[in-house]
Amino acid sequence: MLSERQREAIAVAVDRGYYEIPRQMSHEDVAAAVDCAPSTAAEHLRKAESKLLQSVVGD
């Protein structure tokens, strides 16, 4: 379902508090952790979130 990079980015985000309120890290921090550009990390997160939500909610 998720690409390896999407899975890696979302795992880091969940593990390090990206989805906590308030956030414990930014997408820039996710990018640094997975060694990619911030815009790429944001794209990985958005695509992973979309795929995961579609699997829960359906089409």
Q: Where do the PLM segments sit?
A:
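Acidic, polar-rich N-terminal leader regions of halophilic archaeal proteins
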Residues: 1-59
